[in-house]
Amino acid sequence: MKLNITIGIPTHKRPKLLKRAVNSLIYDENINVKIIISVDGIDNTFEEYKLIEKSVFNKKNISFIYHETKIGSLKNFLYLRDICDTEYFMWLADDDESSLELVCELQKLLDNNLNAVTAVPYWELKNEKNEYKIIQSSHFNDQLKIKRVFKYIYDSDDVFFYGLHRAEKLKKCSFNNYWWPNKDALSNWCYVFQMDLILQGQIILLDNTNLRWINHDYGIKYYPRSSGEKMMKNFSYIMRRINIYYLYILKFLKWKKYIYIIIFILPFIFLLARDIIFKEPVNKRIKF
């Protein structure tokens, strides 16, 4: 099968973890898939990144891009999407792992389901003790758009962000920023971004537990979060939840789904109250 895929790996200050991510994708060069690694800013880890680049120099499909100054995590993610010139695109975090066998199966699934915009695998979550859980990723294969939206806003993880996407559809997704005091924070931004995918088509699951995206949920994260002071943190959280539902309404306007604003206004109020009382995500707290 001919692959027509770009895998984008954004990275910042984590060359050792990046090496593991790249090694998970080493494969037969006859398979047509691009791997683009975007290094966010030249700093004291530059030489380590260059050593990784040198170690894969014979892999013509792997390329490194170095941003002279730091552009930030969000811009680095979107940069990789925007330079994609293949039919399909997926992100891989620099501290996670995937495989070409998985990517092949995700493409087959999309090729056979033309109404789908994204194919997502099972999710293996690992902690610092190397304990892991295999989790079925949230997916939304309903033909009715309104049913997908209901299910998404009620109870979802953001794992399908790391699925395989039709690049044309993904390039229509957007996120700018939150209001103050979360203007520089990125917590939950994927949920807003992914609403564009939900409104464009189905999100389908690769039903094979042997092929999994591996998420290492530990280590230092180099992106801005909400304020750490307790009172301010609680205020920031409430404002962010309000902001997210407001941004969902803007998505409905963007896709001319005006009736959805009327339909979802009461559910949004209910869900906002739920989020404030119980915190989020309600049904996705995972214990090892």
Sequence positions of predicted segments:
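Short, well-formed alpha-helical segments that are part of the catalytic scaffolds
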Residues: R14-Y27
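Acidic donor-binding segment of Leloir-type glycosyltransferases
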Residues: L25-I65
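Glycine-rich, basic loop-to-helix element that forms the pyrophosphate-binding segment
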Residues: H67-C84
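Short aromatic/hydrophobic "clamp" motif used to bind/position activated sugar donors
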Residues: F89
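Conserved donor NDP-sugar-binding/catalytic core segment of glycosyltransferases
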Residues: E101-I134
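Catalytic beta-strand/loop signature of glycosyltransferases that borders the donor
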Residues: Y122, I204-L211
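Short, flexible, basic/aromatic active-site loop/helix in glycosyltransferases
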Residues: Q136-S156
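A short, conserved alpha-helix in the catalytic core of glycosyltransferases
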Residues: K169-C173, P181-D207
